[in-house]
Every structure is written in C-alpha cells, then in structure tokens.
Regions:
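Polybasic/polar functional segments that serve as interface/processing modules
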Residues: 1-105
C-alpha cells in the first residue's frame, strides 16, 4: 500500500542561490504541475542560531514542497511529497531544470 510519493534532490555548489528566487521557482513549478497551493513561506537565516541560508516551503492541498539552503557549504536540499494525484517528480524536474539553467555546471 502506498500513501504518496516523495522525491528528493540535493544540489551542491549552490552558492549565491537567493531564497526569494527559490520560493518563486517552487511556486511556479507547483502551479505548472496542477497542484493547489495552500500557503508558502520563506525563513532566512543569518547564521546566528542556524547555519546561514534559508528554508522555504510551499504547502499543497495534498502535501508540500520544501527547500533548505546551507549557503556556507553550498548545499541546497529540495523535496516534494504528494499523497494526491500530483506527480512530485514533475515538480522536482521543473525546479532542477531552472536551477541548471541559472547555475550551469
């Protein structure tokens, strides 16, 4: 029995990824997938309590898409989960394509 599908993407060398750009990209990918956005939020970290970077999330009617960036080590971890009809792989593929275009190599 399956209760959903979970896809993850880790990007290294993610230096200079802007949190607002990432959240906008996530929303665009969600909208293109046909999923219904419920809420979105970004939290930027200055390194005081957490490592510098950001965490962003787009809540979906059927689950979520999130991204966590650790700018001090250049790591961007993205995941998409759906317990509905939305294919999270489609969301991740759209995000990855835009990241590769903006940050080739």
């Amino acid at each position: 029995m399956t209760n959903g599908s979970h896809i993850m993407l880790d990007c290294t060398g993610a230096v200079g990824i802007d949190g607002d750009w990432m959240l906008s990209l996530m929303k665009k990918a969600v909208d293109a997938s046909g999923a219904r956005r419920v809420h979105s939020h970004i939290e930027k970290f200055d390194g005081t309590l957490s490592p510098p970077g950001f965490a962003s999330v787009v809540l979906l009617d059927e689950s979520h898409v999130s991204a966590h960036c650790y700018s001090d080590i250049g790591l961007l971890a993205i995941d998409a989960f759906s317990c509905g009809n939305t294919d999270p792989a489609r969301i991740i593929e759209a995000i990855e394509s835009e990241i590769r275009t903006k940050f080739p190599g």
